[in-house]
């Protein structure tokens, strides 16, 4: 069964494929307009879960910082594009205040259009340079600068650090992401190749097209080569070839593209009285994920920046997501098992068997649980206590649970007789799994089970489903969740007032108007009752998907 919208405004890139080799290139024609490159090829404005203020708040709490409460905070984003990373928060947290700054007028105009349509009063966007930010902007509890500092001149980079100091509240947290060395060395080789190859073309669309041809040329040229250099180059070229035009334009064909060793970045941060708090990918900080011999040697370094710099060398790291705070704040890096009790926990595991088919008290049965539903990544256990814990998490996918909730629900699965054993099992394992990157901790609250008779999503999701061409919507964890055309039409009507029958009738209306077509085994379904049956068969799996992906409230 496949779905297709006849009114989708999505377009595909039809670059000329008749040029089969670099040798047949011709000189480019046309000129690039004298304005911001992000106006020429706007960067699609995504939500980035790693920048979620709740995630920043959680990591600050883990390391002993009393971070500001997100729902009543002031949040600034530098290089906000069209607001895709900021507007969803403004919808969810009406008592917080949000400010976005971007140099692209096209992007800011789009952001303001969306704000007006959503009727938001707690967010504002400014078409200006980061260098225009001064004390009049005020203090912010969270400052987000994602995918900017590596792509701007030094004068702007210096200003970013200055803003992260002068405009950051006392216990505030600043997030900056950037390209790092040594990992970017190979990527830089390909970037240099694309810049060299496309330099004779003035039109940016031609430069993007020629860069794609070069990537194909590189892959074809090295097809039979098995040297380490060739293997790495082929892999990098293959990854880049799959990226969007706006990614190639702004991440690789941009005039500015600076990479830093971590210690160099931190030297700049220290000049502005900022200190290293954490990396948003906390598992990258954990020495226990390194080989034992490496761990013993790095433990002797006794300097967090130097330690992580050595780890970057070893892992060939290419991108960092660094959290900074004022240098007078006291950071506690002594994490212990009991710290898990401070947070709510998300552990997305899918059991190999339904609970009703399992005897949890059978300590001889080894059960598998798949991480994020991936059968290639799993954990197994014979422990009745851990089985009860994991089944509890599997019933609450993407929904944070407190330590008390997990242990209490798990205990009910064992007839309310093993609470202490369950607590000990969770305490002995949870924090290690956090540091290994399997379990997520958060300051976000647990959500009540959604009412499925009349499903309800957020105002943001309904708006995205109705008015944007993108085939994704933003969930409650600030993640983009892919949707198909049927799901996108259905989401329009999930405002808590429509039941299954009403939603299906509404979608049928779109089918009758020719806005949505359904097919089975390549054949279009024409009969209205057959269409209705098809929609009904799709409805329950869709609702299950929305529940497990934090799209319903």
UniProtKB/Swiss-Prot annotation:
- SUPFAM superfamilies under this entry? S-adenosyl-L-methionine-dependent methyltransferases (SSF53335)
Q: Which Pfam families match?
A: Methyltransf_31, MethyTransf_Reg, PKMT_2nd
What the entry lists under InterPro entries is as follows:
CFA/CMAS, Methyltranfer_dom, MeTrfase_reg_dom_prd, PKMT_C, SAM-dependent_MTases_sf
Q: Which PANTHER family match?
A: CYCLOPROPANE-FATTY-ACYL-PHOSPHOLIPID SYNTHASE (PTHR43667), FATTY ACID C-METHYL TRANSFERASE (PTHR43667:SF2)
Task: Identify this protein by name.
Answer: Uncharacterized protein RP789
This chain's source organism reads: Rickettsia prowazekii (strain Madrid E)
């Amino acid at each position: 069964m496949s779905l297709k919208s006849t009114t989708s405004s999505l377009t595909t890139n039809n670059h000329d494929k008749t040029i089969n080799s670099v040798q047949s290139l011709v000189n480019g024609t046309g000129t690039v307009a004298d304005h911001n490159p992000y106006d020429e090829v706007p960067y699609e404005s995504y939500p980035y879960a790693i920048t979620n203020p709740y995630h920043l708040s959680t990591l600050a709490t883990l390391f002993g910082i009393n971070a500001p409460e997100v729902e009543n905070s002031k949040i600034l984003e530098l290089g906000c594009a069209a607001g895709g990373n900021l507007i969803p928060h403004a919808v969810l947290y009406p008592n917080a205040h949000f400010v976005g700054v971007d140099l692209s007028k096209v992007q800011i105009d789009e952001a303001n259009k969306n704000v007006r349509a959503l009727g938001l009063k707690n967010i504002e966007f400014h078409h200006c340079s980061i260098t225009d930010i001064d004390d009049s902007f005020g203090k912010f509890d969270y400052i987000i600068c994602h995918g900017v500092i590596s792509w701007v001149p030094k004068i702007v980079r210096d200003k970013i650090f200055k803003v992260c100091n002068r405009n950051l509240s006392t216990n505030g947290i600043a997030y900056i992401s950037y390209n790092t060395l040594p990992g970017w060395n190979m990527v830089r080789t390909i970037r240099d190749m694309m810049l060299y190859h496309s330099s004779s073309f003035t039109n940016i669309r031609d430069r993007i097209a020629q860069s794609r041809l070069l990537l194909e040329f590189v892959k074809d040229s090295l097809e039979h080569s098995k040297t380490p250099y060739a293997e790495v180059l082929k892999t990098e070229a293959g990854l880049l070839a799959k990226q969007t035009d706006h990614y190639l334009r702004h991440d690789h064909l941009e005039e500015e593209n600076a990479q830093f060793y971590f210690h160099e970045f931190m030297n700049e941060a220290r000049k502005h009285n900022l200190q290293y708090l954490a990396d948003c990918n906390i598992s990258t900080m954990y020495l226990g994920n390194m080989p034992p011999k490496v761990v013993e040697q790095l433990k002797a370094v006794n300097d967090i920046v130097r330690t992580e710099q050595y780890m970057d060398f070893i892992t060939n790291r290419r991108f960092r997501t660094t959290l900074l705070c004022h240098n007078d704040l006291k950071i506690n890096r002594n994490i212990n098992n009991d710290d898990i009790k401070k947070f709510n926990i998300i552990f997305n595991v899918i059991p190999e068997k339904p609970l009703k088919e399992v005897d949890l008290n059978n300590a001889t049965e080894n059960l598998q649980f798949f991480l994020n539903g991936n059968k290639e990544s799993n954990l197994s256990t014979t422990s009745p206590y851990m089985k009860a814990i994991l089944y509890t998490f599997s019933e609450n996918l993407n929904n944070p649970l407190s330590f008390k909730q997990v242990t209490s629900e798990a205990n009910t699965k064992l007839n309310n007789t093993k609470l202490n054993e369950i607590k000990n099992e969770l305490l002995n394992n949870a924090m290690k799994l956090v540091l290994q990157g399997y379990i997520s901790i958060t300051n976000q609250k647990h959500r009540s089970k959604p009412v499925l008779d009349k499903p309800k999503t957020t105002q943001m999701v309904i708006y995205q489903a109705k008015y944007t061409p993108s085939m994704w919507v933003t969930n409650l964890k600030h993640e983009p969740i892919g949707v198909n055309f049927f799901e996108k039409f259905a989401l329009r009507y999930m405002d808590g007032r429509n039941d299954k029958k009403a939603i299906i009738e509404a979608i049928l209306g779109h089918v009758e108007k020719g806005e949505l077509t359904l097919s089975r085994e390549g054949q279009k379904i024409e009969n209205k009752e057959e269409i209705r049956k098809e929609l009904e068969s799709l409805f329950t799996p869709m609702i299950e998907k929305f529940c497990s992906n934090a799209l319903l409230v």
